[in-house]
Design a protein with these regions (language model features):
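Surface-exposed helix-capping loop/turn segments at secondary-structure junctions
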Residues: 41, 102-114, 160-165
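Conserved C-terminal alpha-helical bundle
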Residues: 36-37, 47-107, 128-135
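GST superfamily/GST-like fold recognition
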Residues: 67-72, 110-139, 144-151, 155-156, ...
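Acidic/histidine-enriched, glycine/proline-rich intrinsically disordered or flexible terminal extensions
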Residues: 169-190
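A basic- and aromatic-enriched beta-loop-alpha substructure that forms the phosphate/nucleotide-
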Residues: 28-40
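Single conserved hydrophobic/aromatic residue that forms the stacking wall/gate
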Residues: 1-8, 12
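A short, hydrophobic beta-strand/beta-hairpin element that forms part of a small beta-sheet core
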Residues: 13-19
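Residue-level signal for nonpolar/aromatic packing positions in well-ordered secondary structure
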Residues: 31, 100, 119, 156-162
Length: 190
């Protein structure tokens, strides 16, 4: 294992438990599952809904980082613009938005009416894609056509905890609307 890579990776070291040594959890999907189980929140108790939740969580883990990052790199950041990778990644991003849009046309959230860790994991990239014109690509991706994804993302973005979370470590905007580091709930007014 590469120790330098591990030093940059997000992880949880849970010392609140009686386990010795402390429990270590890394990778965002594993961290979400661990926290959901530990705090009994955002994780369906029903076996069928839990399977649906895990399926969507793994769908996001396996797709958004690669496709979103690939699209962003070739569309916005690559030193040279090549049509093939831009079109290939854009096609896949649009295919995923279409999958989400069709699913959300019959569901409030990814697991029906229940907000879960699948939504928590999926919202940041796909929500930013349809609501915040990331990479200045909204028109290119035709994000306005994904009306159910837009509705879902707006509902999630309006959640008080999401509003607070969007302030943490945000490098732009008036200083009074930002929280540069998150240490405790007292960092926030509400």
């Amino acid at each position: 294992h590469n120790d330098a890579r591990r030093q940059r990776q997000m992880c949880i070291r849970d010392r609140d438990r009686s386990a010795t040594p402390p429990i270590r959890v890394f990778e965002s999907g594993a961290m979400l599952i661990y926290l959901a189980e530990k705090f009994d929140a955002f994780y369906p108790k029903d076996a069928a809904l839990r399977a649906e939740c895990l399926s969507w969580l793994m769908w996001q883990m396996g797709s958004a980082p690669y496709l979103g990052g690939g699209f962003g790199h070739f569309y916005a950041y690559a030193p040279e613009k090549f049509e093939y990778p831009i079109d290939r990644f854009a096609m896949e991003v649009k295919r995923q938005l279409d999958v989400l849009d069709k699913h959300l046309s019959n569901n409030n959230y990814l697991c029906g009416n229940e907000y879960t860790i699948a939504d928590i994991a999926t919202y940041p990239w796909y929500g930013a894609c349809v609501l915040h014109n990331i990479y200045s690509a909204a028109e290119f991706l035709d994000v306005e056509s994904y009306t159910h994804v837009i509705r879902w993302a707006k509902e999630i973005e309006a959640r008080p905890a999401v509003e607070r979370g969007r302030r943490v470590n945000r490098p732009w905007g008036p200083e009074e609307t930002r929280v540069l580091e998150r240490h405790s709930a007292s960092d926030f007014d509400n």
